[in-house]
């Protein structure tokens, strides 16, 4: 077993799907080796007496036989299997679990709703960047977890008896996507939420994070439709109107919505609209991980880092042997430029963070080859697992690195949706200039500079005589000024 002792597995027997995650511990973080998900729809097999049908149990056992094959290489002490809402509820859960344990060869633990909520929060805390004080929402098949917390500590935990499968069976049983069904589903969800809303609001949050298939589906829809990745009530209402327009569940077609997710999408959407309305949520983003990640990090006993993005960047720099001193040098110059123009350009703090992150990784392409290094950098960043960064933020970083030098590909900056296109252009300009002025790879050779913005015009003022004393530098800046002018970015250098 010595060679496999760094492997860990987490299995989540959910009400809608069964999931298995297999990871390897690498430098205080986890590297995903296997993810398997199977739609089992266990909750749909509950009858009015809360007994699971034989068919539903057989679907579950069949899935576990697939999982069992992969578990043979992992020490039992490094496997955790948990069951959630449906198996908490089912009167014959014991029958299902006995056979499940026999198939898997390890214990299956039915966890309480509060424990599920705590584990979901831990998974989010380990994998999701942004503000420390958060509200986490996870809409499962038969339960919905709502958790507030700061850093690694939860402040309130709730597990509510509503989910996308149970709401589908209850409010969309006729498969009709009419306004009446949505109204009934939302009203019922708000009634379930009302008793806990005050306590959640009392603890408060600076950022709201969604950690479920419904939120994942929304993210995929918004990416496919070129919207930014922030989920708002307005966008949810638009999608509801689109669903109503489709008329029936089997005719539901929305750009970016997969067939696999379509069945429980309207019911999940109704619950999410109720949560947004009842808790007055302004905006939600997708979490980097949830229950399974919480289980894995719990087995590894890893502390929650204050800044997940920084940990990710450090790990990538080590792995690809990036020159950390140079990355810091470029970041320092870029930060200085950013601070000088942020008021004129109305830039937000998150834009500064993303610019600095791009600086930290800008030489990653050299690990492949100097030729086409920006393209290699963009490919690597687009395809690496970057905990703490959302999919849209990864796309922005890749786009910035693609455009760090040479003529600018304006269309790529407009295709990302982490920030408005104009902001992506502005960050790109600052990154390119920072790379140029830190290119000598010595702190004492970075000149004192001022950068002023007047609408799109950038005016860079260098020390007197600098351009005369640095003919190569002068040539590089003249070329850069020309490249920026091609895309209507005026740059004056004095």
From Swiss-Prot:
User: In which pathway does this enzyme or protein participate?
Assistant: Purine metabolism; ppGpp biosynthesis; ppGpp from GTP: step 2/2
Q: Which reaction does it catalyse?
A: guanosine 3'-diphosphate 5'-triphosphate + H2O = guanosine 3',5'-bis(diphosphate) + phosphate + H(+)
**Pfam families, A to Z:** Ppx-GppA, Ppx-GppA_III
Q: Name one GO molecular function term.
A: guanosine-5'-triphosphate,3'-diphosphate diphosphatase activity
**Entry annotated with the keyword Hydrolase:** yes
> What's a GO biological-process term for it?
guanosine pentaphosphate catabolic process
Provide the alphabetized UniProt keywords: Hydrolase
The UniProt record lists the EC number as: 3.6.1.40
The record's annotation in InterPro entries points to: ATPase_NBD (IPR043129), GppA/Ppx_hydrolase (IPR050273), Guo-5TP_3DP_PyrP (IPR023709), Ppx_GppA_C (IPR048950), Ppx_GppA_N (IPR003695), PyroPPase_GppA_Ppx (IPR030673)
Q: Could you tell me which PANTHER family the record lists for this protein?
A: EXOPOLYPHOSPHATASE, RETROGRADE REGULATION PROTEIN 2
The record's similarity note reads:
Belongs to the GppA/Ppx family. GppA subfamily.
Protein's job = Catalyzes the conversion of pppGpp to ppGpp. Guanosine pentaphosphate (pppGpp) is a cytoplasmic signaling molecule which together with ppGpp controls the 'stringent response', an adaptive process that allows bacteria to respond to amino acid starvation, resulting in the coordinated regulation of numerous cellular activities.
The cross-references to NCBIfam families, in alphabetical order and at most eight, read: PRK11031.1
Output this protein's name. Answer: Guanosine-5'-triphosphate,3'-diphosphate pyrophosphatase
Q: What organism, scientifically named, is this protein from? A: Escherichia coli (strain 55989 / EAEC)
Its lineage opens with: Bacteria, Pseudomonadati, Pseudomonadota, Gammaproteobacteria, Enterobacterales
